[in-house]
Amino acid sequence: MNRFSKWITDFLRPPKEARLDLGRRAVIGAGLAGVGGKLLFGVAPEASRRTFNPALIRPPGALAEDDFLARCIRCGECMKVCPTNAIHPASLEGGFEGLWTPVMVTSLGYCDYECNLCSQVCPTHAIRQIEVAEKQKIKIGLAYIDRSRCLPWAYSKTCIVCEEHCPTPKKAIWFEEVEVRNIQGEKLTVKQPRVDPELCIGCGICEVKCPVKAPAAVRVASVGESRNPENQILLTNDSYGQG
């Protein structure tokens, strides 16, 4: 290689500090996108209403959405300590303001009933510190049965997996014995699962353990979460008819 060619090669070669691997570059870019979105769009008034999404399930102890977005610095500490891989960075579940903030993805992991680690490591208290006993009473969402996919409902097959794994002291998933007929016209008694919205905390273990996959026959949505009294599936006597 002559001196001119070497000079051209050296000139075109990026500096060492610019040679990032794609994995690191993606992580840094995503982090900057989250921070940039926060700076560019800010936390809009009543962001939680405007960006409501059933998939926007925050970890237990998360503040009300506007306060949460104002405090969360997208550090990822809660994601790192989650033992069941349930907490992941948000894409657009919470709008641009919520980029890279932590959300529960209950198709991938569940909130362990005996765990409160995410609340212990949050440096800004966007997820407030809570003891396990308090955490166990916080509703982060509500499970619901997809009757078109559930084995007892759709196929008259016996399955009690969701109820077996439900961790609440009084099971949030219970069964009703129903007499049905199979395709041959024979009478069968099957146990069809139901969800008690008063007892369900939305932990997602039923979704993870469900033998039906992609998607599961029981899934969790953010409706019913403790942190937002307006995000409820049921009308109470006090709220009925009020604007």
What do the PLM-derived regions correspond to, one by one?
Residues 1-243:
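Non-ligating segments of multi-cofactor redox enzymes
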